[in-house]
């Protein structure tokens, strides 16, 4: 594993628990299609606060989960050390998007504010519904409306009025009571 400067790495998933005794690990992908995580290579793992490159040896589906075999990780003990480690890729491997299109990983972590200025919470994940993507927004601890989570459709211009990735803010035309 080689060290990599941190400035251009974006998290695209996370290694999960071990699978079997030969070094396989479950994987959690934050790409829109789970297997799309394999389109972006090379991978970097965040180990002790630093990104280190790693080579993917193999992957496959197992019981509706994706499991991976990383080069040099050949037993359960070595794999256990990597459990819950973030997977990143260099931003340069992502294609440029058109105006109004965003990568999910850019939206996750953004603060959502409605037009009345009420902070509705933070985007924790994205959901695909078939008709449109949905922002899953974890409400603030002491939400005035008693909400723990909000599901807000990502309809650009209709609901989502502005996305500012510099300040990590999404402005929405959405009632805080929903």
UniProtKB/Swiss-Prot annotation:
Cross-referenced SUPFAM superfamilies: PRC-barrel domain (SSF50346), Translation proteins (SSF50447)
The UniProt record lists the keyword Chaperone: yes
GO CC annotation: cytoplasm; ribosome
Gene Ontology molecular functions: ribosome binding
BP GO terms, sorted: ribosomal small subunit biogenesis; rRNA processing
Annotated localization: Cytoplasm
Keywords: Chaperone, Cytoplasm, Ribosome biogenesis, rRNA processing
Ranges of residues in domain PRC barrel: 99-178
Xref: InterPro entries: PRC_barrel-like_sf (IPR011033), PRC_RimM (IPR056792), RimM (IPR011961), RimM_N (IPR002676), RimM_N_sf (IPR036976), Transl_B-barrel_sf (IPR009000)
Pfam families the record matches: PRC_RimM (PF24986), RimM (PF01782)
Principal location: cytoplasm
Described function: An accessory protein needed during the final step in the assembly of 30S ribosomal subunit, possibly for assembly of the head region. Essential for efficient processing of 16S rRNA. May be needed both before and after RbfA during the maturation of 16S rRNA. It has affinity for free ribosomal 30S subunits but not for 70S ribosomes.
Self-association and partners: Binds ribosomal protein uS19.
The record's note on its domains: The PRC barrel domain binds ribosomal protein uS19.
Family in the record: Belongs to the RimM family.
UniProt name for this protein: Ribosome maturation factor RimM
Species, as recorded: Haemophilus influenzae (strain 86-028NP)
Name of encoding gene: rimM
